[in-house]
Amino acid sequence: MALKLFDSLTRNLRELQPSHPDGVFRFYNCGPTVYAPAHIGNFRTFVVNDILRRMLELEFGAPKVKHVRNLTDVDDKTIKRARDEGRPLADVTRQWTDKFHADCAALNCLPPHIEPTATGHIREQVDMIDCLMQKGNAYRAADGSVYFKVSSFSDYGRLSRVKERELQIGSALAGKSQAVDADEKEDGSDFALWKAHKPDDGENSWDSPWGRGRPGWHIECSAMSKKHLGETIDLHTGGVDLLFPHHENEIAQSECCNGVQFSRHWYHSEHLLVDGKKMSKSLGNLYTLDDLKQKGFSPMAVRYALLSGHPRKQLNFTLDSLHAAEKALATLRAYRATLAAGGAAHHVFAPVIAALEDDLNTPAALGALFTIVNRGKGEADVESFDRVMFALGLKLDAPTAPKAEVPAEVTALAEKRWAAKQAKDFATADALRKEIAAAGWSMLDRKDGYSLEPAKK
């Protein structure tokens, strides 16, 4: 059975195949904006992409897959974080890039073959913007910013079906006039390709034919995918939140500049809910991987829980699902210990692989796996089982001892101490540290905050 994946563009299940003469499958997925730790909603998308990468390698062979994932290291959020902390932009983005890599490794996500940064590809972005200017798809505003003219691309909206939703995409398409905004865009739906330098940007600007500034968000993916994968790629993926406007804008930029189809296949994973609600800081349900580790859960349990729902359906993430995941992993470890060496029993686990080949149906794959496990070892062998574990990205090493959960009262003391330290009230901060120590905890300060660990006895 061939690997088939739902295509967000055609709304059909389609077989994945490389299109270039060298037989290499070219795969791009949007990476993080590195200004803060990624949360588990972000990691659902990255884990899904990791499963896809693994299945592509099983299908075509590892040397025949080329995976690119970008890092957005300059935008409004990264610049604001650097300004607020009084640090160079590169220091801030390096810190959060390192953290992202560490979390990906803990979740057993394969690193991309190439991980380009926006700041490392300014020339490529300027060149693509210049191409769009030359072809009449972009224009320079009075302040030096450059905008893409949405009305110049007749196919705009075909990915997201914006026209079907009667979304205003410009006076030329919608037949209605729209007010010109403060940035002097010709139409309200036009989007920035190049942002003219403003005082809040600090030193984070570059020279261009239109004056100093920085690239817009959308152009980076078009420029970097072109450089590293070519003008037409086989697959572009991301979370459903990126479908519009980001991916729609990528198509417009790339196809207007290059004159060929940008991506042959599009795939989007759905949102993650926590306890049935959308994640938000105000609800206290915006978990990072570290948050869950501090509650005593292993990264593999987090990965397993993220696989428990179909990637194209919303997944309700709960702490109960993590407890269930830990038990499931223990069962898989015990099962593997009963298996003998060998490698001829791939047919035993064929239903698991078949489920993954059918639109990455991870819950069906896990169900098929436990049907096999519950029957006993039978003909199964270690190598065949490990092949399935590779496909799912599950490492069955013995988990480390779980960390103790921090009591709410200790967390409250830590928050007060951190606030006192930020206010330079060091006497209060020292007194609160002693209270925390008396409760059996150590508070460790970091540049970006603090951590709590049980005090050493």
From Swiss-Prot:
<keyword id="KW-0067">ATP-binding</keyword>
<dbReference type="Pfam" id="PF09190">
    <property type="entry name" value="DALR_2"/>
</dbReference>
<keyword id="KW-0479">Metal-binding</keyword>
<keyword id="KW-0862">Zinc</keyword>
<dbReference type="GO" id="GO:0006423">
    <property type="term" value="P:cysteinyl-tRNA aminoacylation"/>
</dbReference>
<dbReference type="Pfam" id="PF01406">
    <property type="entry name" value="tRNA-synt_1e"/>
</dbReference>
<dbReference type="InterPro" id="IPR024909">
    <property type="entry name" value="Cys-tRNA/MSH_ligase"/>
</dbReference>
<feature type="short sequence motif" description="'KMSKS' region">
    <location>
        <begin position="278"/>
        <end position="282"/>
    </location>
</feature>
<comment type="subunit">
    <text>Monomer.</text>
</comment>
<dbReference type="GO" id="GO:0005524">
    <property type="term" value="F:ATP binding"/>
</dbReference>
<feature type="short sequence motif" description="'HIGH' region">
    <location>
        <begin position="32"/>
        <end position="42"/>
    </location>
</feature>
<feature type="binding site">
    <location>
        <position position="30"/>
    </location>
    <ligand>
        <name>Zn(2+)</name>
    </ligand>
</feature>
<keyword id="KW-0030">Aminoacyl-tRNA synthetase</keyword>
<dbReference type="InterPro" id="IPR015273">
    <property type="entry name" value="Cys-tRNA-synt_Ia_DALR"/>
</dbReference>
<dbReference type="InterPro" id="IPR009080">
    <property type="entry name" value="tRNAsynth_Ia_anticodon-bd"/>
</dbReference>
<dbReference type="InterPro" id="IPR032678">
    <property type="entry name" value="tRNA-synt_1_cat_dom"/>
</dbReference>
<feature type="binding site">
    <location>
        <position position="250"/>
    </location>
    <ligand>
        <name>Zn(2+)</name>
    </ligand>
</feature>
<protein>
    <recommendedName>
        <fullName>Cysteine--tRNA ligase</fullName>
        <ecNumber>6.1.1.16</ecNumber>
    </recommendedName>
</protein>
<keyword id="KW-0436">Ligase</keyword>
<dbReference type="InterPro" id="IPR014729">
    <property type="entry name" value="Rossmann-like_a/b/a_fold"/>
</dbReference>
<dbReference type="GO" id="GO:0005829">
    <property type="term" value="C:cytosol"/>
</dbReference>
<keyword id="KW-0547">Nucleotide-binding</keyword>
<dbReference type="GO" id="GO:0008270">
    <property type="term" value="F:zinc ion binding"/>
</dbReference>
<dbReference type="GO" id="GO:0004817">
    <property type="term" value="F:cysteine-tRNA ligase activity"/>
</dbReference>
<keyword id="KW-0648">Protein biosynthesis</keyword>
<dbReference type="InterPro" id="IPR015803">
    <property type="entry name" value="Cys-tRNA-ligase"/>
</dbReference>
<feature type="binding site">
    <location>
        <position position="246"/>
    </location>
    <ligand>
        <name>Zn(2+)</name>
    </ligand>
</feature>
<feature type="binding site">
    <location>
        <position position="221"/>
    </location>
    <ligand>
        <name>Zn(2+)</name>
    </ligand>
</feature>
<feature type="binding site">
    <location>
        <position position="281"/>
    </location>
    <ligand>
        <name>ATP</name>
    </ligand>
</feature>
<keyword id="KW-0963">Cytoplasm</keyword>
<comment type="similarity">
    <text>Belongs to the class-I aminoacyl-tRNA synthetase family.</text>
</comment>
